[in-house]
Amino acid sequence: MEIRKKPNIPMCLVLDSSSRPFMTLLFTILLFLTGLASAVGAVGGSPTAGFKPADDILIDCGSKSSTKTPEGRVFKSDSETVQYIEAKDDIQVSAPPSDKLPSPIYLTAKIFREEAIYKFHLTRPGWHWVRLHFFAFPNDKFDLQQATFSVLTEKYVLLHNFKLSNDNNDSQATVQKEYLLNMTDAQFALRFKPMKGSAAFINGIELVSAPDELISDAGTSLFPVNGFSGLSDYAYQSVYRVNVGGPLITPQNDTLGRTWTPDKEYLKDENLAKDVKTNPTAIIYPPGVTPLIAPQTVYATGAEMADSQTIDPNFNVTWNFPSNPSFHYFIRLHFCDIISKSLNDLYFNVYINGKTAISGLDLSTVAGDLSAPYYKDIVVNSTLMTSELQVQIGPMGEDTGKKNAILNGVEVLKMSNSVNSLDGEFGVDGQRASMGKQGMVATAGFVMMFGAFVGLGAMVYKWKKRPQDWQKRNSFSSWLLPIHAGDSTFMTSKTGSHKSNLYNSALGLGRYFSLSELQEVTKNFDASEIIGVGGFGNVYIGTIDDGTQVAIKRGNPQSEQGITEFHTEIQMLSKLRHRHLVSLIGYCDENAEMILVYEYMSNGPFRDHLYGKNLSPLTWKQRLEICIGAARGLHYLHTGTAQGIIHRDVKSTNILLDEALVAKVADFGLSKDVAFGQNHVSTAVKGSFGYLDPEYFRRQQLTDKSDVYSFGVVLLEALCARPAINPQLPREQVNLAEWAMLWKQKGLLEKIIDPHLVGAVNPESMKKFAEAAEKCLADYGVDRPTMGDVLWNLEYALQLQEAFSQGKAEAEEVETPKPVAVPAAAPTSPAATTAAASERPVSQTEEKDDSTVDQHSGTTMFTQFASLNGR
């Protein structure tokens, strides 16, 4: 083997035939090691590996020469950046060197007594950091502590009437304001505008490109938990960037030159948290997460629950961050499971301002492995803000793996308001922001007070007009209803409602129950109080403080429905009131609980009275009345609100019966609004097997006809008294809809009806009922009737059955003479004729047009002739 070097030619290896195999292997190993080193460098090497900012403009304002910071960054002097500034006159001031300052850029400043503008040409538009550095050092030109000024861009207000002495109590402290702006133009300007009679100043300016993946356009909103899009349309101010459980991270150790502060000053109780750490090289970024989001040093440290090994660690670790309640906030939470020994062993909840932000977080599942970073972006609306932003982590409280929780980092960014301001309520053009929360509260208070006076007047008037016949005092009195003023509700209670109150009436969410109150009424959710079990969780019976018996549905944190459906049901039921819809009384979401409180339905689900529970069989008339009640409830959902509502989970277990067997539709966790004018909602397929609309399944387009199909299956359950799906039966009988329609087409449907109905059903009534079910089960939604049409046919079937029953009773009476003496016949009087006529069924033509009686039994008219409050 020889090595030859030619002039101006790169060195190369020339191998003889004897050494080629060995050298080939050596060369392969060399290439492998080179690639491995590159890979390690990409993950754990240079902090800024993988990203070089297109724009990196650093200015040391007031400096006569360039300045190098401790982290090695070079800020250019005034003379090197003169092309950026437009100012009538500016004053340069400086301070003597000091080792107490974090950077030498704070030793000089530029003072403006009139408006001054810095203009920059961007190499590449997009996300940029804008960092403004301030330090009010003593000088003989101007008292910088008293300088009052604003800083604006073409679109955003960054600082409004800013005064350093107001922003920081420590006059010797430096201040850095960091902003993240999505710049869409090639030009960017910073305007310093002193207040009249004052001055503006600046020590240093940074304008640095940020990676596009730093903030995506979509996140998650808090309460209700929903998707939040349009994040790229906001400007952001970094308020807190915290390395939980770890030390200060300086810009030279961050992937994007950021500063991460320790979390101890924000911890509410340090005794509840325990710092944990691992070697940063153990952190492996999964696909979709890069070191640019946060460096390995953030994910390699964290805080877990202290004493997590105790039998019942029922507490949360809490961090409090002082905040401005007038703004929305963007919260980025960083997680990395560095405490578990195996996968799927750590489940915990995350709360923001007392609301559940993440339920049942399993980091090894969402991140794909242990020691794999994961982050979550959450938008907190200003209506949920107070003077402090609170972040909490805690165990799920169920038997789900290790009772522990972990948090590795927190970033809190203020979001620009409706006039694109990050400071104050005025925009660049002087326009004022929309009414803030305090103004909303004041206005809401006035509306509520006005509504209370109106309601009080109505009560007094009704009291004066009350019935004087005290034997009628048990009759329904409308003046005892809750008083509504807009979306606010006022109610009285025998105990003054000292345990709980109506929560956020502006949201119309009903009464908020404390967890301790619900634990008391359910004997701490004792199994003996369970009256039902569903996919969402257990249902308990209880009696609240005013003596009302209620059903309390406690969500299972591992439920497939989850927190989204929990909030959906609250919002749906809080705005719906109908005789045939179950009423929501209130809810509780304390400590990650998802609890709904309903009116108690003593006779339980419709299904229990048809099969499986050995209850007394329902008569055909009772089944018809129950189906009619459910149809009325669904018809109201589809047409009785400004936006139609599709239930999406109609089935016999979601039709509940009260003590009088009045049917009420329940369980709105999967429901969807349909905007007026739209005929469908494109959404993922959800529902219950056996009731699912085949067209919805094929096209993933949900319509009100999807509910109609499901209701058709319920009708067959009522007729045949068997489940919608029974896999234990022969193959052709498994699916009730297919099996029943097969017999219907043969004209032999009566062969498969509930044996308890044989001989007790009017054939014409059953025929009309079966026709209604068949139409509901049409393959295509366009061929199915509306719920109003279904309701008409069911009421007709009920009238046929009532006529049949009455005729049968009269025939039996004729056949069985009474063993008493019969007086001589007397002439029939007009009164007798009238009485006899009143006993026969009332025909459609004999009904009064203004009749709007809505009884669950004894129907005397068809619903289509009554006011259904439809759209």
Curated annotation (Swiss-Prot):
Known EC number: 2.7.11.-
SMART domains given in the database record: S_TKc (SM00220)
Keyword Chaperone: no
Annotated segments matching region Disordered: 808-871
Extracellular side: 40-439
Matching CDD domains: STKc_IRAK
InterPro entries: ANXUR1/2-like (IPR045272), Kinase-like_dom_sf (IPR011009), Malectin-like_Carb-bd_dom (IPR024788), Prot_kinase_dom (IPR000719), Protein_kinase_ATP_BS (IPR017441), Ser-Thr/Tyr_kinase_cat_dom (IPR001245), Ser/Thr_kinase_AS (IPR008271)
Biased composition (Polar residues): 854-871
GO MF annotations, alphabetized: ATP binding; protein serine/threonine kinase activity; transmembrane receptor protein tyrosine kinase activity
Designated name of the protein: Probable receptor-like protein kinase At2g21480
Source organism per UniProt: Arabidopsis thaliana
Lineage: Eukaryota, Viridiplantae, Streptophyta, Embryophyta, Tracheophyta
